[in-house]
From Swiss-Prot:
Aspartyl-tRNA synthetase with relaxed tRNA specificity since it is able to aspartylate not only its cognate tRNA(Asp) but also tRNA(Asn). Reaction proceeds in two steps: L-aspartate is first activated by ATP to form Asp-AMP and then transferred to the acceptor end of tRNA(Asp/Asn). ATP binds at residues 221-223, 488, 540-543. Belongs to the class-II aminoacyl-tRNA synthetase family. Type 1 subfamily. NCBIfam families: aspS_bact (TIGR00459), PRK00476.1 (NF001750). Its EC number is 6.1.1.23. This is Aspartate--tRNA(Asp/Asn) ligase. It comes from Agrobacterium fabrum (strain C58 / ATCC 33970) (Agrobacterium tumefaciens (strain C58)).
Length: 595
């Protein structure tokens, strides 16, 4: 028999009754029932109930063991009586009668419980992550993460993609966040950067003639954490293809990712045909470029119903500024003054003046609008609004007015709030879509200049003609995001593989040809030696896993995450370098000036 085990703690069944076996694992629980000890023995695979009665030679050792001790048990498999069968356990029809117990490792008093799922302070959980990872839900999440990544790898292989590994030590590049810098010992005063993404390398692979690339790529960005983004590092399914249009990228990746979701969705419906929604349409209908399509509320422009109306607040805004629009946020079943007042109070808590609203009820056999707005604009306009929005008695509608560029985010939040309050969102499904036709440029209010809206390596729609002849802010990019349930799960584009177009695009944001050659020299040179049309995308593995396991934040699907202050409490990182290390790198720590 093997030194430590003949079976795992999930393997034994009724067919094994009568066998002498050996198990090893952690003591999950110890219970004393009238002098008979019951030990739940746990390993990575499951739990087996072990019985040690006073007549057993293993009883003396069994009396000493405590929770989370590691032990080896030899014993006889017996069938449980009918009234003690546990149908909730894979091994619930049998129990192991202990004949010998060997203690392999003792455990100190635990700083956090492993049994059950109680809430516990995050700093304790992260400092003792090796214990936290023993908890059932977190352990299961990590296993599922591995399975999801394996499924992605298989799917990409089945599509004819090959996995290539790109460098971790590379040059700094403007991907939209701060770089993690690594000082060079050999080249004093010079630094590598950890890659924010393998963007340039995967494009260089296409120039080198590798047709279909993918990689489970670690990415590093020195940015502030939030629920759907961890500090430090994250992982993405990075993809690139040669000789493709954006439609080719969508039709390749969409079925593969749909299959991954269906495999792990536990029966929840998954969108099979992902709609393509232009960016401008997504902003207008949903107030977001990451719309949650489980929410049935679709916003509409209703400016004409308030133009010249008796509601002077909106009417005067429309008359004084051609950019002003009025958007409607219809809320079916929300037709009560109490609900409308709650929504208005919420808007004020968000720093807004409030939300105009109308709610409809049945009066004398017909549907009539109620509320201050309805009185101000009159019965005819109120009825026209109801007809346009398809509302009935018992429904409501909220209104936001101004420059959409300034209010669309709030309107989107109001749409979400209304749906949450009215319980309109079906949370047991995965709704996917592609957001397409992103702006190529945007105006940077802080720096008062034109900047790239997203990926600077995207191909502008219209090519050189658009760059030379159009208002930069009107140019669209061959760029797209994949969205699931309100989360961006992928971003990609068709790349700009022309050196002339590349220089012209960067000129628009204030960078010269020499700047381009200095910052993106490898890519710029490569494009001068026959670059194929190419494009791709990257799916955020962490967010995909978070959605599939139903976790509330990324720490629940990550092995060893940092805390909100970007610290690894388990490994005590970051930590000071030694004087010798600093000297070898020709570095000196200069304390920052405190205000």
């Amino acid at each position: 028999m093997h030194r430590y085990r003949s079976h795992t703690c999930a393997a034994l069944r009724k067919s094994d009754v009568g066998e002498t076996v050996r198990l090893s694992g952690w003591v999950h629980r110890v219970r004393d029932h009238g002098g008979v000890l019951f030990i739940d023995l746990r390993d990575h695979y499951g739990i087996t109930q072990v019985v040690a009665d006073p007549d057993s030679p293993a009883f003396k050792v069994a009396e000493t063991v405590r929770g989370e001790w590691v032990i080896r048990i030899d014993g006889l498999v017996k069938a449980r009586s009918e009234d003690t069968i546990n149908k909730g356990m894979a091994t619930g029809e049998i129990e192991l009668y202990a004949q010998e117990i060997e203690v392999l490792g003792v455990a100190k008093e635990l700083p956090l419980p492993v049994f059950g799922e109680p809430e516990y302070p995050e700093d304790v959980r992260l400092k003792y992550r090796f214990l936290d990872l023993r908890r059932e839900t977190l352990h299961r999440n990590i296993v599922k993460r591995t399975q999801i990544i394996s499924s992605m790898r298989k799917g990409m292989g089945d599509l004819g993609f090959a996995e290539y590994t790109t460098p971790i030590l590379t040059a700094s590049s403007p991907e939209g966040a701060r770089d993690f810098l690594v000082p060079s010992r050999i080249h004093e005063g010079q630094f590598f950067a950890l890659p924010q993404a393998p963007q340039q390398y995967k494009q260089l692979l296409m120039v080198a003639g590798f047709d279909r690339y993918f990689q489970i790529a670690p990415c590093f960005r020195d940015e502030d954490p939030r629920a759907d983004r961890l500090p430090g590092e994250f992982y993405q399914l990075d993809v690139e293809m040669s000789f493709v249009t954006q439609e080719d990228v969508w039709t390749t990746m969409e079925p593969m990712m749909t299959a991954v979701f269906e495999q792990f969705a536990e029966g929840k419906p998954v969108t099979k045909q992902w709609p393509r929604i232009p960016y401008d349409e997504s902003i207008r209908k949903y107030g977001s470029d990451k719309p949650d399509l489980r929410n049935p509320i679709v916003m509409e422009a209703v400016t004409e119903h308030f133009d010249g109306s008796g509601f002077k607040v909106f009417a005067n805004m429309i008359a004084s500024n051609p950019k002003v629009q009025v958007w409607a946020i219809p809320a079916k079943t929300g037709g009560s003054r109490a609900f409308c007042d709650r929504m208005n109070a919420w808007a004020q808590s968000q720093g807004q003046p409030g939300l105009g609203y109308i709610f409809w009820k049945e009066e004398e056999g017909k549907v009539a609008g109620s509320g201050p707005l309805a009185k101000n604009i009159g019965e005819e306009r109120t009825e026209a609004l109801r007809q346009q929005l398809g509302l009935e008695a018992g429904d409501a509608c909220f209104f936001v007015a101004g420059d959409p560029a300034k209010f669309y985010k709030f309107a989107g939040e109001a749409r979400t709030r209304a749906a949450d309050e009215l319980n309109l969102i079906d949370r047991d499904r995965f709704e996917m879509c592609w957001i397409v036709d992103f702006p190529f440029f945007e105006y940077n209010e802080e720096e008062k200049k034109i900047d790239f809206a997203h990926n600077p390596f995207s191909m502008p729609q219209g090519g050189m003609e658009a760059l030379e002849g159009q208002d930069p802010l009107s140019i669209k990019a061959f760029q797209y995001d994949a969205v699931c349930n309100g989360f961006e799960i992928a971003s990609g584009s068709i790349r700009n593989q022309s050196p002339e177009l590349m220089v012209k695009a960067f000129e628009k944001v204030g960078l010269s040809q020499s700047d381009v050659e200095e910052r993106f020299g490898g890519l710029y040179r490569a494009f001068q030696y026959g670059a194929p049309p190419h494009g791709g995308c990257a799916f955020g593995i962490d967010r995909v896993v978070m959605l599939l396991v139903g976790a509330k934040n990324l720490r629940e699907i990550t092995l060893f995450p940092m805390n909100q202050q970007a610290q690894d409490l388990l490994m005590n990182a970051p930590s000071p370098a030694t004087p010798t290390q600093l000297r070898e790198l020709a570095l000196r720590v200069v304390p920052s000036k405190k205000d």
